[in-house]
C-alpha cells in the first residue's frame, strides 16, 4: 500500500480547485449568472489558491467594491453562459469611452478586456442591446454625479472666499479698537447669584483698584505720612497683581471727583536713590468731608462708605448707556432708574465704553535749552569765537523752512463714519400690524423682566425646578410604598435623588410651593411636632407637568 502524501489531504479540507472565474464588467456579480466551476487538478506540487464558490460563506467584498455609486446597482451582473470557456474573445463595447474625471473609474474594465474570459459569449458575438443600454445609462448617471460634485466644490470655495471680504473692512472702520478676551467680554454672564445690575469686567477691576488704593492711602494718612503716587503704586500692585498707573488714578478721579486732592510737590522725603528730593512728585490727600463726619482719620466705616459711593457712581454710568440702548430699540423703551433691577437681555454690559481719565496735576515746566539759538544766547560768554560761529551756522541752517527738521508730521486720516444699518429684508411681505403686535409683546416681556424684584426671580427659579421635583417625589412615594411620609424623610430622599444640588431646607421650600400649586395631588399635614406629606399616586404625571409649565409661563411674563 502506497504511503499518502501530505498534499493529498488538501482536497478534503478545502473546496476543490476550479478554473479562474471570468470577471464581469459590473463590480458586483450576480450569483444567478455564474456557472458551476469544473473541478481540475493541478499537476504541480504547489497548492493553488482556489476561488470562492458562489454558495459558500465568504467575507464581505473589498472596500473598493463596496464603495459604489447608487446608480451602478442597475448594471448587468453577468452575460450569457459560454459554450467554450477556453476561447476568450473581447466584447464589442459600443458605449462611449468613460470620462476620466467621472466618479466611476473605468480602469477595471480596461484591465480585464484582454485577460477576462467572458461567460456565455461565442466568438464573433456581441452583447445584447439591453446590457449595452444599461451600461450607457450607468455612464450618463456617473457623469451627471461628477458634474454635481464639481459644482458643489466650486460653491463651497466661493462661500469660503466671501466671509473674508467684510473682515478686511473692519480695520479701516475701527483701526484702534482691540478685541478684548472672552473672559472680559462675557464677564457679566459668569457672575454667581441672581442676575442684577452687574458691572462690566473693566469696571469691576476699577472698583478693586479703588479699594486697594483707599486701603494704602488710609494706612499712610493715619500715620501722618505724605502719600505719594510711588508709594500707592507699589502697594496696589502688590495687592492686586496688576499694573497700576496714573491713567487708573485719572479714571478714579473721573468717577469719584471728591475722593482725593492731587498736588505736585517737591522736597518730599522719598528714602530712595531713584527719586531725587528736589523732583516733583504727585501727592494724594483723602478728602474727609461728609463721609467721616469731620474726623481726621480714615476708619473702616469711612472706607466702606467711600467704596459704596464709588460703585454706585459706576452703576449710574452704566445706567446712562443702558438708557441710550433702550431708546435705540424699535419700539423704544423707557424704564425708571429706581425700578430697574437688571439689564436688558440684549444689552451687552461688557461692551460699555471705558472711562476717560481726568487730568492730573503735572509738574511745573522748567526752562530748558532746546534750540541752538537758546544755547548760544545763554553760553555766548563761555564759548570760543570758532565754536560760536559753528553754532550760529547750525542755527541758521535749522531755521530754514525747507529743512527736513521743520517738516510737520502728517495728520491721521479721519475714519469714515459707520453707515446706518440697513433694514432686514427677511421681514419683507409680513404684515406691519403683526410686527407691531409682536414687538409690543416683546417690549412687555422685557419690561417685566427688567423690573422684576429678587423675590420674584427666586420664585421663578423654583417654579422651573418643580416638574423634575414632582417626578422624583412620585418615585420616592412609589419606592417607599406608604401613603404618607414625614417632611424630613421626603427631603432627605429627594436631596439624594435630585440632580440639582439643594439643601434640605431649600427642598422643603420647593415642596411647600408644590403643595400650594397642586393641592389636589400633594398635601401637607401638621400633626404635633412633625409635618407629613401625602401624595395621590393615581393622578397622571403628564397632566401635572403641563399644569406646572403653565404656571411658569404665566409668572414668567
From Swiss-Prot:
Quaternary structure note: Interacts with GMNN; the interaction inhibits the binding of the MCM complex to origins of replication. Interacts with MCM6. Interacts with CDC6; are mutually dependent on one another for loading MCM complexes onto chromatin. Interacts with PCNA. Interacts with LRWD1 during G1 phase and during mitosis. Interacts with NDC80 subunit of the NDC80 complex; leading to kinetochore localization. Interacts with KAT7. Interacts with ubiquitin-binding protein FAF1; the interaction is likely to promote CDT1 degradation.
Organism: Mus musculus
GO CC list: kinetochore; nuclear body; nucleus
Keywords: Cell cycle, Centromere, Chromosome, DNA replication, DNA-binding, Kinetochore, Nucleus, Phosphoprotein, Proto-oncogene, Ubl conjugation
GO biological process, one term: response to sorbitol
Homology family: Belongs to the Cdt1 family.
Cited function: Required for both DNA replication and mitosis. DNA replication licensing factor, required for pre-replication complex assembly. Cooperates with CDC6 and the origin recognition complex (ORC) during G1 phase of the cell cycle to promote the loading of the mini-chromosome maintenance (MCM) complex onto DNA to generate pre-replication complexes (pre-RC). Required also for mitosis by promoting stable kinetochore-microtubule attachments. Potential oncogene.
Motif (PIP-box K+4 motif): 1-25
Modified residues (Phosphoserine): 30, 107, 392
SMART domains, A to Z: CDT1
Keyword Nucleus among UniProt keywords: yes
Positions of the UniProt region annotated as Interaction with GMNN: 163-203
Compositional bias (Pro residues): 82-106, 407-422
The protein's name: DNA replication factor Cdt1
Region (Disordered) location: 20-113, 397-427
